[in-house]
């Protein structure tokens, strides 16, 4: 059976490093701060934001939550972002998506100062990622790279296939793998002979949003399989985009759902917030 990549354990190790670095900064009178803006009453977003707050505080950082009603105007939200851009105690700004339909997500993301864009969605940070310049990388893709490296595998020279082409996961993770000198293919719902394409991968990243979509015939024996999915199966049980039980014998390493990619996302957000603070303080 393939070796399980323990995302919880790795996330804890990275968070401990961040926490000890924050403690050193606090001794010097410097405290990194993360502000999260939550619009409306989406329960999933609320739970996720609460989790982010708890983890931010555990890391010794300042945590600010700004809650706005579903009916808030775009103008008011942009004003809130502008105030956070100018607030010297805040080093990371995150506007929880999705936003209500009457608000342009693009406008809001563009309004966040790219120095404080710890989600890595601002066009400047996206551009920096694509030219290989150090920047804020979206948290889930950053976590995926850490998970792959934790297996002790050298990414350079490997064939990587990413199934999924979203701006949040698929494209950035493909670019990060390219920056690590892998040979990368991006596949998606229109890709012909998808199982054959996937089976060439030494590293397979699956982000389709389709429960148990990837079966054993997609997997090269010994491949690293990273499952980004968070779905429900026919019994309403949490599962990923990879059929774990079908694939686990074939894979060399595999992330479980839950407990694989998920725990890494908030940890990388904390790492990005620390990085933002150090940049603003010119400590890098």
Curated annotation (Swiss-Prot):
Catalytic activity, as annotated: (6R)-5,10-methylene-5,6,7,8-tetrahydrofolate + NADP(+) = (6R)-5,10-methenyltetrahydrofolate + NADPH; (6R)-5,10-methenyltetrahydrofolate + H2O = (6R)-10-formyltetrahydrofolate + H(+)
Highest taxon, organism lineage: Bacteria
Family annotation (SUPFAM superfamilies): Aminoacid dehydrogenase-like, N-terminal domain, NAD(P)-binding Rossmann-fold domains
EC number: 1.5.1.5, 3.5.4.9
A Pfam family assignment: THF_DHG_CYH
Presence of the UniProt keyword Iron in the record: no
Residues that coordinate or bind NADP(+): 164-166, 189
Pathway connected to this protein: One-carbon metabolism; tetrahydrofolate interconversion
Disulfide bonding pattern of the chain: none
InterPro entries on file: Aminoacid_DH-like_N_sf, NAD(P)-bd_dom_sf, THF_DH/CycHdrlase, THF_DH/CycHdrlase_cat_dom, THF_DH/CycHdrlase_CS, THF_DH/CycHdrlase_NAD-bd_dom
Protein keywords: Amino-acid biosynthesis, Histidine biosynthesis, Hydrolase, Methionine biosynthesis, Multifunctional enzyme, NADP, One-carbon metabolism, Oxidoreductase, Purine biosynthesis
Single GO cellular component term: cytosol
MF GO annotations: methenyltetrahydrofolate cyclohydrolase activity; methylenetetrahydrofolate dehydrogenase (NADP+) activity
One GO term (biological process): L-histidine biosynthetic process
Family, similarity comment: Belongs to the tetrahydrofolate dehydrogenase/cyclohydrolase family.
Function field: Catalyzes the oxidation of 5,10-methylenetetrahydrofolate to 5,10-methenyltetrahydrofolate and then the hydrolysis of 5,10-methenyltetrahydrofolate to 10-formyltetrahydrofolate.
Subunit structure and binding partners: Homodimer.
Name of this chain's protein: Bifunctional protein FolD
Lineage: Bacteria, Bacillati, Bacillota, Bacilli, Bacillales
Name of encoding gene: folD
């Amino acid at each position: 059976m393939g070796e399980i990549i323990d995302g919880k354990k790795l996330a804890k190790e990275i968070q401990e490093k961040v926490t000890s670095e924050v403690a050193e900064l606090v001794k010097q009178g410097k405290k990194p701060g993360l502000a999260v803006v939550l619009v409306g009453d989406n329960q999933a977003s609320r739970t996720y934001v609460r989790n982010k707050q708890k983890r931010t505080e555990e890391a010794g950082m300042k945590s600010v939550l700004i809650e706005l009603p579903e009916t808030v105007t775009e103008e008011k939200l942009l004003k809130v972002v502008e105030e956070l851009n100018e607030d010297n105690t805040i080093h990371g700004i995150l506007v929880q998506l999705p936003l209500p339909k009457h608000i342009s997500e693009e406008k809001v993301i563009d309004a966040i100062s790219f120095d404080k864009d710890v989600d890595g969605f601002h066009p400047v940070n996206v551009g920096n990622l694509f030219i290989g310049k150090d920047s804020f990388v979206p948290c889930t893709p950053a976590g995926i790279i850490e998970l792959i490296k934790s297996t002790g595998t050298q990414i350079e020279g490997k064939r990587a296939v990413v199934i999924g082409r979203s701006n949040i996961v698929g494209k950035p993770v493909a670019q990060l793998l390219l920056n690590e000198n892998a040979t990368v293919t991006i596949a998606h719902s229109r890709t012909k002979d998808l199982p054959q394409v996937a089976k060439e991968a030494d590293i397979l990243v699956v982000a389709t949003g389709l429960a148990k979509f990837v079966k054993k015939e997609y997997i090269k024996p010994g491949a690293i399989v990273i499952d980004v999915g968070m779905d429900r199966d026919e019994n309403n049980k949490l599962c990923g985009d990879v059929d774990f039980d079908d694939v686990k014998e074939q894979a060399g390493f595999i992330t479980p759902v839950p407990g694989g990619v998920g725990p890494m996302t908030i940890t990388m957000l904390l790492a990005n917030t620390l990085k933002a603070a150090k940049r603003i303080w010119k400590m890098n």
